[in-house]
Amino acid sequence: MIASCLYYLLLPAARLFRFLSDAFFTCRKNALLAKSSSPQVEGNFAMAPRGPDQEECEGLLQQWREEGWNQTPSTASEGPLADKGLAESSLALLMDNSGEQDAASEDKWSSRQLSDLRAAENLNQPFPEVLGEEPLAEVEGPLWAAVPVQTGPQYADCAVLPMGAMAAEQWEEDPAMVAWSIAPEPMPQEETSMWPFEGLEQLQPPPMEIPYHEILWREWEDFSTQPDAQGLEAGDGPQFQFTLMSYNILAQDLMQQSSELYLHCHPDILNWNYRFANLMQEFQHWDPDILCLQEVQEDHYWEQLEPSLRMMGFTCFYKRRTGCKTDGCAVCYKPTRFRLLCASPVEYFRPGLELLNRDNVGLVLLLQPLVPEGLGQVSVAPLCVANTHVLYNPRRGDVKLAQMAILLAEVDKVARLSDGSHCPIILCGDLNSVPDSPLYNFIRDGELQYNGMPAWKVSGQEDFSHQLYQRKLQAPLWPSSLGITDCCQYVTSCHPKRSERLKYGRDFLLRFRFCDLACQRPVGLVLMEGVTDTKPDRPAGWAECIFEEEISELEPVFPRTIGTIQHCLHLTSVYTHFLPQHGCPEVTTMPLGLGMTVDYIFFSAESCENENRTDHRLDRDGTLKLLGRLSLLSEEILWAANGLPNPFYSSDHLCLLASFGMEVTAP
């Protein structure tokens, strides 16, 4: 209780004592400041020269009291120096200093000095213009706080500027400080482009100063005047010329499902509307006669791609992937150049077969070229065009080989002519295999020994998962129930055609001469002596019955080779997969920043003897001749344009474009 009383009594007394002591020391400090022998202050606060006449100073002080004392405001908000008694004591101490002062400047100096003392005391800072005095500690607080301007009636021409305000004016006017000023914070925008994928941060727009047209320029390589592999010059006869493009256009759904592959891209260039406009410009620029597309999203195809391509003069066929997949393959052709003979969609999914449980598809079209009327009575062989997108998984090379075998069997059936030969063939698409891989060599060379080969090696794609588990290919690669031989042909295509009437030879019928059924007397047979009354004697060693398997017509048997698959389509690649002018490989895509070739255009060519080389088959132009191609780019060039996709190419693949010529023969 006593402690509480002492607390409430002594605390106010201590505060009062502290207030009085602070006021006293403040006045004393100001008096010493005025008496300081420092150099004169320049500017508006310059002091008049001091003289020895102290009586004149007292007279001036008395005059100031009579004229301005009654008009000086006294408010509690101005601090201790605003008190009338403290101001009077401060002025008295200031006048104790002997010196002669000018009467005209005394009044002006006194009023401004008092205002500056008040401002300095309020901020607890030393007078900034007096030299030789040690600065006091700065008060913690915001430097740029707004302080109202204080003025008095008799000091209307001199406002009290706080120290922070003066510093602010100096900051704005000093060009040296402005040069080092911090950049202003960006203002919030109403619309900000955001990533279309969750969990990704916003990136700055791509630098538009990149010359995409110059970096990504692709040359057209003309082979129309070059000799073929045997050194034979190109023929001068008429040709049916056409161009074909193969393009994986990157389905939007697949891009969003694998968003981590496109972190290097600005979100604006990944927008489908932007990509669709770019793709259509590419189609219009190159204007191919046949267009083979992969990763075509179904809703985009029916709503945008098919109507737009139809307006460009194309007739399109589309095959969506099986299952719940939303993309597929499309083949488009110009009806002014070709007439459709047949279209065959190919599904690689086979229920019950673990090897073929994937949803990839393909399309095979048989087209008849339309010869211009000016060439007269001439004919051109049909053209078989196959388009596919093979499984990506690098670890399942067995699945890729089985899918390719199904496609080749379908091509063999569609392209086979009545004499057993094949019409010209073009096979293109995204095969998800690199050049010189076993799958690539199988398509080009027509043969592959796969028994014991690790599955991850088939496509040649970089993948280290095989180190944990190696799946090796075993013969036979696919079961006989698939109906495809090891020569990649349908079993039904290899059967000789049967007629409805059965034909039996004499030797075959004589085998039934002494069988049990032949030796029995038919019921109701009229008995005639010497004719129907005798029973034939069966010779020794003659079988009493004929087994069913002996009389049934045997199905043709196709022996399966041990660990080897073949095909007889004689395909070769349009591209060489190497850029001699750059000394580096060609690139059609850049997954995870690694450039590689996985897209191809194969076409049928005639094989010829290779006396100097035994590793690769040497081909020459046949009915189908390669006239030109659009060059590919290197990995270094694509990285200079920030990879794929970019503002110039709106897919993660480059398009492939080739020009062909077909022989025109007289009927």
From Swiss-Prot:
UniProt record similarity statement: Belongs to the CCR4/nocturin family.
Pfam families with a match to the protein in the record: Exo_endo_phos
Record's protein name: Protein angel homolog 1
Molecular function terms from GO: catalytic activity; eukaryotic initiation factor 4E binding; protein domain specific binding
Residues bearing PTM Phosphoserine: 77, 105
GO cellular component, one term: nucleus
InterPro entries: CCR4/nocturin_mRNA_transcr, Endo/exonu/phosph_ase_sf, Endo/exonuclease/phosphatase
Keywords attached to this entry: Phosphoprotein
Keyword Transferase assigned: no
